[in-house]
Amino acid sequence: VKKKILLKGPLLTRSGYGEQARFALRSLRSREDLFEVFIQPLRWGQTSWTSDMDEERLWIDQTIEKTIGYIQQGGQFDVSLQVTIPNEFERLAPFNVGYTAGIETTKIAHQWIPKANEMDKVIVVSSHSKQVFENTEYQAQNTQTGEQVLLKTQIPVEAVGYPVKTFDNLPELELGLSTAFNFLTVAQFGPRKNLQNTIKWFVEEFRNDDVGLVVKSNIAKNCLMDRNKLHGDLTNFLRQQGERQCKVYLLHGDMTDAEMHSLYNNERIDAFVSLPHGEGFGLPLFEAAYSGLPVVTVGWSGQLDFLVDTEGQEQFYNVAFDLQPVQKEVVWDGVIAAESMWAYAREGSAKEKMRLCYENVKNDTVAWNNTRLSERFSENVMYENFINALGIEIDYDWMKTLSQIEII
């Protein structure tokens, strides 16, 4: 009577969608009384594959083998859960759920709407993504009748964030930082993350201070070739910024979740800064915040779900921004629409908030903390939220009967 559910997604990759797929899997595994899980893994662009070999990875590998055999024998599924961009949604079962990060801009691509409407339910990672899905409309023409129609998402869209990660023991990281105060930023080196401006404005603001910026980044992969390319680009870029006392450190390479949390909790890391144009959710921001780091970021998009508390109070250094059209070079047909907009951090505000954060931490006058995030976003709470968001009818009468059966 368990529902046979096919989880299709890049759950073995080091990517945002990989993180989503693993969260979906953990949610499903928290209710093994309801679901029999099958897995179809996907690649994800140029991103690296995870190297972890733990109980979960072994279970995934065994389940992939089971799935291949089941499909070869003509096996069918009750539910599909597809972790990908909406362009790739398809009907694979009687009940289909699309699980996407959604969008970091003000508008979803028109191609997403009919694909989303093929699903029975769509789950996104933030209130921002949910609102953009629900509010995007296009005027379209019926190719058969010539009639004008309104293109709009018609199916239910639910937002579910990520859970906090907890560790019994964190590995010790020796960072070798020589500066007295250090900001951390974690981002792939691409246009959306706005890393060049983040680094440039940091250098200009702290040019003569004993302050460092640790940049955990890559271009596409965590390999040596990627590191050498990024190191060269960053060195050339910093050379153009002139003489300085402040320092920029490049941290590159594959790091486990435990190692990343050791980085957030390292005694030499004092604050987190990120000035992206938009976030579906903003996982590094979330992890930094619940690890107790003061956060400097833009007050727009997915990160507001956790950087604003349940009473509506901001728990971060809010950098002012302007909503402007996305850059021409990031327009991606079928994903990032040319007519969409995202946030551009204001230079003066970014420098002012970084400086204020620096002074507050030094003087121990940071006015807030994010300790309650561990309760709001606990694993149990988020797994339950995700299972509920699936919208699958569960035969609770059968479960009740099952619980009453006595073992003789």
Stretches with model-predicted labels:
Residues 1-76, 384:
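N-terminal pre-catalytic "stem/leader" segment of glycosyltransferase-like enzymes
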Residues 6, 176-193, 199-202, 213-215:
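Conserved donor-binding/catalytic core segment of Leloir-type glycosyltransferases
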Residues 6-8, 46-132:
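Extended catalytic core of nucleotide-activated donor transferases of GT-like folds
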Residues 121-169, 320:
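Donor nucleotide-sugar binding/catalytic pocket of nucleotide-sugar-dependent glycosyltransferases
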Residues 224-263, 270-271:
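Nucleotide-activated donor-binding/catalytic signature segment of Leloir-type glycosyltransferases, i.e.
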Residues 277:
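Aromatic "clamp/platform" in nucleotide-sugar-dependent glycosyltransferases that forms part
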Residues 294-297, 308, 314-318:
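Short hydrophobic beta-strand element within catalytic cores of glycosyltransferases
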Residues 341-349, 359-390:
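A charged, aromatic-enriched C-terminal amphipathic alpha-helix characteristic of glycosyltransferases
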